[in-house]
């Protein structure tokens, strides 16, 4: 018995407060006490109560709360509740960070992370089971398109659980920026509707100056071979390039190309030959836009790494050879300038298609969605891995539903301007699923497989490895607090169910691609959880943040190509202009690139979340060390970038978002 001091924290978003009454109960190991005091939670405020409890409750296990309403259910966003018992006892935190709706009773467990094995008396077992049962009703698996990895069920935003929706500041920013982009598009369309574009400089009419210094650099230098090669190392899509171990079988040399073959073999022997192969686009159905057939290629680019770190193209093949036909032409830097430029435009357009669909949408957004749904279905809020990973899952479901209803939907942006639209994008996503290997989501393995370890001019590779290592140590710190032995890992049924749900259900049998169906050791847990967090943070940032820089100048990343790939080398400026997107397609590409690629004013940098899901000093110390290491990496990148002609920013912790939220 004695006096209890209770603090209740309400979120700061616009509608977080409530005019409904909230009643509280304290649940301890030896009893339960209803608190007669009721409160009206105010937005952004902490409310403090002092309540005399007549009986001894023992160690506190839960705070229960119920919001009552007579006429209107006014939802309340509760951050947390803390309780300090009689005397000078420690303050006990009960994290919530969710909306409280309706009249039901919500139980919040004390914030210490606990596995099933950490609860031998079963004090939390009923709560775990009931919470997961309710979550499995809210978070159901859906299948947007047959043959793809699974997604959350629900075709519209209103189908999502309320806790997955944008808070007001995020929603307003997203919708206002979209309206601004579309309004600008309408203005540019009206100004250019009767204009015939004849020169590459005409793309300046839809280029947004002042948005990105690097974008302006791309506009001025996009024709240069050095910038073309640089993008494979450090551009918007740095995950295609690999070091050659042999000359690709598809690279058929027509008569008279013996010198080229010898040059390639020399670079191969020296370990300086690299390739970017877009064979995945072969056979993909090209879009038809307003009755006009669009076109796709499946290029191969062979590049050489020079001693100064520059990556320069040696040859471009735009199509795969076909039986019974002459070998496709090989385009060279020594070809007529327009022929070589057009070949590079085809490569850039192909890279754009694969980047947005495979690297960004599939491997970033949709993979993160699998992690979100599996986590919500399999890990209760008291589980330490849930507490560790939940900050990195914020807003992912809403941004993905918006993508499925606006970008890749029927008559969406892809259908309007992308050469892979009109069904080709779905076909490509299905085929790309075969390349979702476990190792490809883990930079130490992926970079080794692609031969990029030790390439000094690959800043993506260097920064990805450093960020992965920092996240791994963070995960390792939390895992070591809760799993003292490998047996504890094997004996955690919730952890094993979560792993299996991701691999077998969400990823549709990905054990054939190296994903685990069970976790047998602490090292395996650390590796798997690090993969999840890195996918939702660093890897998504590396393929998202470069869009405004590299795609604003449309000729550097054409969303579609209006003429077939060339089979001769007699291209003219007229050929190039007739092939590149028209003004409406280019304007819409610019508008969407700005909206999605701009630096987000409402964002949380990796590791900087305000939510505190763990109680106790040990997890807080692990998080503090994580933040210190992130700050040190950020400073190192800043110092390095100051010496570079083109700074590489996309994996700076201060601009890497904490989740897939845009």
UniProtKB/Swiss-Prot annotation:
Cofactor(s) for this UniProt protein: Fe cation
Pathway per the UniProt entry: Lipid metabolism; hydroperoxy eicosatetraenoic acid biosynthesis
InterPro entries reported in the protein's UniProt record: LipOase (IPR000907), LipOase_C (IPR013819), LipOase_C_sf (IPR036226), LipOase_CS (IPR020834), LipOase_Fe_BS (IPR020833), LipOase_mml (IPR001885), PLAT/LH2_dom (IPR001024), PLAT/LH2_dom_sf (IPR036392)
SMART domains, alphabetized: LH2
Lipoxygenase domain span: 115-662
Source taxon at top rank: Eukaryota
Catalytic reaction equation(s): (5Z,8Z,11Z,14Z)-eicosatetraenoate + O2 = (12S)-hydroperoxy-(5Z,8Z,10E,14Z)-eicosatetraenoate; (9Z,12Z)-octadecadienoate + O2 = (13S)-hydroperoxy-(9Z,11E)-octadecadienoate; (5Z,8Z,11Z,14Z)-eicosatetraenoate + O2 = (15S)-hydroperoxy-(5Z,8Z,11Z,13E)-eicosatetraenoate; (5Z,8Z,11Z,14Z)-eicosatetraenoate + 2 O2 = (14R,15S)-dihydroperoxy-(5Z,8Z,10E,12E)-eicosatetraenoate
Keyword vocabulary terms for this entry: Calcium, Cell membrane, Cytoplasm, Dioxygenase, Fatty acid metabolism, Iron, Lipid droplet, Lipid metabolism, Lipid-binding, Membrane, Metal-binding, Oxidoreductase
Domain PLAT: 2-114
Cofactor detail note: Binds 1 Fe cation per subunit.
Binding site for Fe cation: 360, 365, 540, 544, 662
Location in the cell: Cytoplasm, Cytosol; Cell membrane; Lipid droplet
Membrane-related topology note: Peripheral membrane protein
An example molecular function term from Gene Ontology annotations: phosphatidylinositol-4,5-bisphosphate binding
Any Gene Ontology biological process: phosphatidylethanolamine biosynthetic process
Disulfide bond residue pairs: none
Enzyme class: oxidoreductase
GO cellular component: cytoplasmic side of plasma membrane; cytosol; lipid droplet; membrane; plasma membrane
Quaternary structure annotation from Swiss-Prot or TrEMBL: Interacts with PEBP1; in response to IL13/interleukin-13, prevents the interaction of PEBP1 with RAF1 to activate the ERK signaling cascade.
Domains (record comment): The PLAT domain can bind calcium ions; this promotes association with membranes.
Function: Non-heme iron-containing dioxygenase that catalyzes the stereo-specific peroxidation of free and esterified polyunsaturated fatty acids generating a spectrum of bioactive lipid mediators. It inserts peroxyl groups at C12 or C15 of arachidonate ((5Z,8Z,11Z,14Z)-eicosatetraenoate) producing both 12-hydroperoxyeicosatetraenoate/12-HPETE and 15-hydroperoxyeicosatetraenoate/15-HPETE. It may then act on 12-HPETE to produce hepoxilins, which may show pro-inflammatory properties. Can also peroxidize linoleate ((9Z,12Z)-octadecadienoate) to 13-hydroperoxyoctadecadienoate.
Record-stated family: Belongs to the lipoxygenase family.
PANTHER family: LIPOXYGENASE
Protein name stated in the entry: Polyunsaturated fatty acid lipoxygenase ALOX15
Species of provenance: Pongo abelii
Gene coding for it: ALOX15
């Amino acid at each position: 018995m004695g006096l209890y001091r209770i603090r209740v924290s309400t979120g700061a978003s616009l509608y977080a407060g409530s005019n409904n009454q909230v009643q509280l109960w304290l649940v301890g190991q030896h009893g339960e006490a209803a608190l007669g005091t009721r409160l009206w939670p105010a937005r952004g405020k902490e409310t403090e109560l002092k309540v005399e409890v007549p009986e001894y409750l023992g160690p506190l296990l839960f705070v229960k709360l119920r919001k009552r309403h007579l006429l209107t259910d006014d939802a309340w966003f509760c951050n947390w509740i803390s309780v300090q018992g009689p005397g000078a006892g420690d303050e006990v935190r009960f994290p919530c960070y969710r909306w409280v709706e309706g009249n039901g009773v919500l139980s919040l467990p004390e914030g210490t992370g606990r596995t099933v094995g950490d609860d031998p008396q079963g004090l939390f077992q009923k709560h775990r089971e009931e919470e997961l049962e309710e979550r499995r009703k809210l978070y159901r698996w859906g299948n947007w398109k047959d043959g793809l990895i699974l997604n959350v069920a629900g075709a519209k935003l209103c189908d999502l659980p309320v806790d997955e929706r944008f808070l007001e500041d995020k929603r307003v920013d997203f919708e206002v920026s979209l309206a601004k982009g579309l309004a600008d598009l309408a203005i540019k369309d009206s100004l250019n509707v009767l204009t015939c574009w004849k020169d590459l400089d005409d793309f300046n009419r839809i280029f947004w100056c002042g948005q990105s210094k690097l974008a302006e650099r791309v506009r001025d230098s996009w024709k240069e071979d050095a910038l073309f090669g640089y993008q494979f190392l450090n551009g918007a899509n740095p995950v295609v390039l690999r070091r050659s171990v042999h000359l690709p079988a598809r690279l058929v040399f027509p008569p008279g190309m013996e010198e080229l073959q010898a040059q390639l073999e020399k670079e191969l022997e020296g370990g300086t030959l690299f390739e970017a192969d877009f064979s995945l686009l072969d056979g993909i159905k090209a879009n038809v836009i307003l009755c006009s057939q669009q076109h796709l290629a499946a290029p191969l680019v062979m590049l050489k790494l020079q001693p100064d770190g520059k990556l320069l193209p040696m040859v471009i093949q735009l199509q795969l050879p076909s039986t019974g036909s002459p070998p496709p032409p090989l385009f060279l830097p020594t070809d007529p300038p327009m022929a070589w430029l057009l070949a590079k435009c085809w490569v850039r357009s192909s890279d754009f298609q694969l980047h947005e669909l495979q690297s960004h949408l599939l491997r970033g957004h949709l993979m993160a969605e699998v992690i979100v749904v599996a986590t919500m279905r399999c890990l209760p809020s008291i589980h330490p891995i849930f507490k560790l990973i939940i900050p990195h899952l914020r807003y992912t479901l809403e941004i993905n539903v918006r993508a499925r209803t606006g970008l890749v939907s029927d008559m969406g942006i892809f259908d309007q301007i992308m050469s892979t639209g009109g069904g080709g994008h779905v076909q490509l996503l299905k085929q790309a699923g075969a390349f979702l290997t476990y190792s490809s989501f883990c930079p130490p393995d992926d970079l080794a497989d692609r031969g990029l370890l030790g390439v000094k001019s690959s800043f993506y590779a260097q920064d990805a490895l450093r960020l992965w290592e920092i996240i791994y140590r963070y995960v390792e710190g939390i895992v070591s607090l809760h799993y003292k032995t490998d047996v504890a890992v094997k004996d955690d049924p919730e952890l094993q169910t979560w792993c299996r749900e991701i691999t077998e259900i969400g990823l549709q049998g990905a054990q054939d691609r190296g994903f685990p169906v069970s976790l047998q050791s602490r090292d395996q847990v650390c590796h798997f959880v690090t993969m999840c967090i890195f996918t939702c943070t660093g890897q998504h940032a590396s393929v998202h943040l470069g869009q405004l820089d590299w795609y604003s100048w449309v000729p550097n990343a054409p969303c579609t190509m209006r003429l077939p790939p060339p089979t001769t080398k007699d291209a003219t400026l007229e050929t190039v202009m007739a092939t590149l997107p028209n003004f409406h397609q280019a304007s819409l590409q610019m508008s969407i690139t700005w909206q999605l690629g701009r630096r987000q004013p409402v964002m949380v940098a990796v590791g900087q979340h305000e939510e505190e899901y763990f109680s106790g000093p040990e997890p807080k110390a692990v998080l503090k060390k994580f933040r210190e290491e992130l700050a040190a990496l950020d400073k190192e990148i800043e110092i390095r970038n100051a010496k570079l002609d083109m700074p590489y920013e996309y994996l700076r912790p201060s601009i890497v978002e904490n989740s897939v939220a845009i």
